[in-house]
Amino acid sequence: MATFPASLLILNGKGADNQPLRDAIGLLRDEGVEIHVRVTWEKGDAQRYVDEARQLGVETVIAGGGDGTINEVSAALIQCQGGNVPALGILPLGTANDFATSAGIPEALDKALKLAIAGNAVAIDIAQVNDKTCFINMATGGFGTRITTETPEKLKAALGGVSYFIHGLMRMDTLKPDRCEIRGENFHWQGDALVIGIGNGRQAGGGQQLCPGALINDGLLQLRIFTGEELLPALFSTLTQPEENPNIVDGASAWFDIQAPHEITFNLDGEPLSGQEFHIEILPNALRCRLPPDCPLLR
């Protein structure tokens, strides 16, 4: 274990009192592994800690938190200039952990930590919106975005990813589709969308497989649109007979342009972005990530 490379863990402030994590880090340190720990408090901390990690010369920056933390650390890493950019490690500590789950990251802290420190580093894609904001997992629009942003923190803490589904059922009366136009490579669609998922990864909202065919190293974004007037029948049909569902539109492209006559909001791995025009493109091989050898998101 003493030969493991040095790493810096960027820990979401909500996980600072995680005793099992403290114990796991302590055991690794006792075995000679060099692990620096930094805790985020406010927006911009991840960028500062990534800069510090490069100064320390560590080989891995570990994102300890949920999808939002992973996204923030990833966005900071792709801003690095020059060589010796650390790889990304993932320690799933959030409510839903959608990206980590679909990537096959172990749930056990000790196993996830060892993978994050010494796993094989693979080049993966990341998505960029309007030439500035990034997401590593998925951009969701429509009803799903409102649910994930409005679900109470206490409900998420008590029930985890299931809380999104429960809160969604409670808010069905507010369901309204968003009219928009979406263009991509050999793709064009215009109409009313209940839910829009644009995935580099596969799932969002606590385990919902919105883009089940997505891969994180194929240079493509996967698109899925739920249309129609009723959301529950569309979702049920997706689970039972997705290939026969007329209310589902699928597409794949290295980029998508979205225009709407009114303001709509996308949730980018937990970060809301509102507007009427969105240009979303894939950045191939944008960073290296330590993943399990049988990661289902790799081609």
UniProtKB/Swiss-Prot annotation:
Binding-site positions, Mg(2+): 215, 218, 220
EC number: 2.7.1.-
Cofactor: Mg(2+); Ca(2+)
Keywords: ATP-binding, Cytoplasm, Kinase, Lipid biosynthesis, Lipid metabolism, Magnesium, Metal-binding, Nucleotide-binding, Phospholipid biosynthesis, Phospholipid metabolism, Transferase
Cross-referenced PROSITE patterns: DAGK
One Gene Ontology biological process: phospholipid biosynthetic process
Subcellular location, principal: cytoplasm
Family according to the record: Belongs to the diacylglycerol/lipid kinase family. YegS lipid kinase subfamily.
Name this protein carries in UniProt: Probable lipid kinase YegS-like
Lineage per the UniProt record: Bacteria, Pseudomonadati, Pseudomonadota, Gammaproteobacteria, Enterobacterales
